[in-house]
Amino acid sequence: MASFASLVKKELTQLEVHPEHAKAELSALIRMNGSLTLMAHRFVLNIQTENPAIARRIYSLIRQVYHHEANLVVHRKMKLKKNYQYIVRLTEGVNDILSDLSILDPDTMAISTTVPASVLKEPQRMRSYLRGAFLASGSVNNPETSRYHLEIYSLYDNHNAGILKMMNHFNLNARTVERRSGYIVYLKEAEKIADFLQVIGATNAMLKFEDVRIMRDMRNSVNRLVNCENANMNKTIDAAQKQIENINYLKNHVGLDNLPAKLREIAVLRLAHPDVSLQELGAMMPSGQISKSGVNHRLRKLNQIAEGYQQPEDA
């Protein structure tokens, strides 16, 4: 069964985007998953992923935006035989494409690891860049079985800062932490994770996430209610037990006939009906129905009298 993260990424790879927004998505995918090699005095670009749908997405975006045909190379990982590595390899127009995506400086040939300023200026490009970043190195926990958590990994601090800035532009309350091998921006609030999925265009995944979240919250609410009711029931049982113990003490040491009539009446009734509620006791009063608070007051008075007699014995 596919993971929730896989379902999100599959949906993202099927979105249609405007060429300018496709550039922003490509910029993230290449900056985060790409590598350059020199072959016959020219650059060869390799963009690597373990997800075949993402590999097809990269291939399609390059063809859509730059009209270049890339090659798709598949490798089997020897250590993990079930896993394949998909490499989108581009041998033509690499310098021009990387320059256009603000990854390569055509004059100095320096590689930029920062989010392009042109992306940070326009919300739709930010959405597309975040989509590419999530496809490249993002993950999200299954909302049905795990704690809520979504993250995007970056190798470089300045790139991580750009991801954080974009996510918080959309009021996602994102946070960041340094890891041994890089940096991550993460979300832990369910509502913000749903908002992020909406931001990057994973609408169906967002709706599924929200459905699961609502059911999970309902289950938690029911459990809290049941626990609260159980706690209240235990308190009621403990209180009734204490009342009966005190009434029996008075019966054996004082005599119920020596109590005031109203207290004697409630004492006899409580002994006869140890399991009923205060409200039910009030309705059973032979001299006439009284309120729950009235019953409670009389029983508290009996407790006080019994405890007053017991204190000298304890001393």
Curated annotation (Swiss-Prot):
GO terms for molecular function: DNA binding. The keyword DNA-binding applies. InterPro entries: Homing_endonucl, Sporu_reg_WhiA_N_dom, Sporulation_regulator_WhiA, Sporulation_regulator_WhiA_C, WhiA_LAGLIDADG_dom. Residues 277-311 bind DNA. The keyword rRNA processing does not apply. Keywords: Cell cycle, Cell division, DNA-binding. GO terms for biological process: cell division; regulation of sporulation. Belongs to the WhiA family. HAMAP family: HTH_type_WhiA. Involved in cell division and chromosome segregation. NCBIfam families: DNA_bind_WhiA. This is Probable cell division protein WhiA. It comes from Lacticaseibacillus paracasei (strain ATCC 334 / BCRC 17002 / CCUG 31169 / CIP 107868 / KCTC 3260 / NRRL B-441).
